[in-house]
């Protein structure tokens, strides 16, 4: 997500343009385009499966190029197409297996440090934050396979979703639990402001040097600045049409809490910095 504009254009827009040209050349029956919820940008409110032009907040190269790549497919008239916008894809729900580190994984080293530094009986607080749509890769594969073969769906866009999503606060709470870290209580922004108001004003500078601390954490763990936008993610995705179709095939996204342990264990054993350096 932190790559520069040129690299993103070449990979996302240029790659899609070449793939469409190939599909036309071989006279493919249908072009199946894997887009992303990023095509909606940072739209404030509910973004449906039928919305596209309404996307806003496309300043980031990743959002911009995902949107522009999908636009190429939508304008295509020489071949039939279907578009899939999965959420934030993580590892296999049973094994935790994953081949890359991005999205929530950026924050795993920091969560591990907190878990190692603080006792499990300690109770901490965190704001609830925005809702994130996280999906395990095996669910995405099963969902796309079913949707690709569903009759009469050409020209449609699908959200293979976690129908409930998970707030940033609950995501951190579940990951801390998987890492055997401190227990986390989730509060809304108003409650946190009320709590901070009880701290003597003279002590605030020593309590929350937030900007400096946040910058140090991001630099230490290589967290891209753009990844912080997930903390207050403003978009809710309506996946009513997709969920109705998937229900016919008995396909349903498991809640993140049910497979967080597998995701965490696989990361520690295979994707953590020291695990990768030892390969």
Label each residue range with its predicted role.
Residues 108-125, 131-183:
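Alpha-helical substrate-binding/gating segment
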Residues 110-127, 194-248:
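A hydrophobic C-terminal alpha-helical subdomain
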Residues 13-19, 65-73, 107, 140:
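Conserved catalytic Lys-bearing alpha helix of Rossmann-like short-chain dehydrogenase/reductases
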Residues 2-6, 10, 14-61, 81-82:
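Conserved Rossmann-fold NAD(P)-dependent oxidoreductase catalytic core, especially the SDR/UDP-sugar
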Residues 21-22, 56-87, 92:
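Active-site Tyr-X1-5-Lys
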Residues 226-228, 232-279:
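Amphipathic terminal alpha-helices
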Residues 9, 13, 58-67, 101, ...:
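Short-chain dehydrogenase/reductase
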Residues 12-18, 130-143, 148, 161-167, ...:
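C-terminal, well-structured subdomains that either form a transmembrane helix-short loop-helix hairpin
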């Amino acid at each position: 997500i932190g790559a520069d504009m040129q690299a993103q254009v070449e990979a996302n827009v240029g790659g899609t343009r070449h793939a469409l040209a190939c599909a036309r050349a071989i006279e493919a029956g249908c072009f199946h385009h894997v887009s992303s919820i990023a095509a909606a940008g940072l739209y404030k409110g509910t973004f449906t499966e039928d919305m596209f032009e309404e996307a806003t907040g496309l300043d980031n190269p990743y959002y911009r190029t995902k949107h522009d790549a999908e636009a190429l497919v939508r304008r295509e008239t020489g071949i039939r197409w279907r578009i899939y916008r999965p959420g934030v894809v993580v590892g296999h729900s049973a094994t935790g297996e994953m081949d890359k580190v991005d999205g929530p994984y950026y924050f795993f080293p920091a969560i591990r440090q907190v878990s190692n530094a603080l006792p499990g009986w300690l109770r901490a607080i965190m704001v609830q934050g925005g809702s994130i749509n996280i999906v395990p890769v095996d669910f995405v594969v099963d969902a796309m396979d079913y949707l690709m073969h569903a009759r009469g769906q050409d020209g449609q866009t699908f959200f293979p979703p976690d129908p409930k999503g998970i707030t940033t606060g609950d995501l951190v709470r579940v990951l801390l639990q998987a890492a055997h870290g401190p227990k986390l209580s989730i509060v809304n922004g108003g409650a946190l402001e009320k709590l901070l108001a009880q701290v003597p004003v003279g002590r605030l500078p020593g309590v929350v040097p937030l900007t400096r601390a946040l910058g140090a954490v991001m630099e230490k763990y290589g967290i891209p600045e753009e990844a912080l936008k997930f903390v207050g993610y403003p978009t809710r995705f309506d996946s009513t049409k997709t969920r109705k179709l998937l229900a016919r095939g008995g396909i349903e996204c498991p809640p993140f809490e049910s497979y967080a342990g597998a995701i965490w264990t696989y990361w520690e054993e295979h994707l953590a910095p020291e695990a990768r350096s030892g390969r």
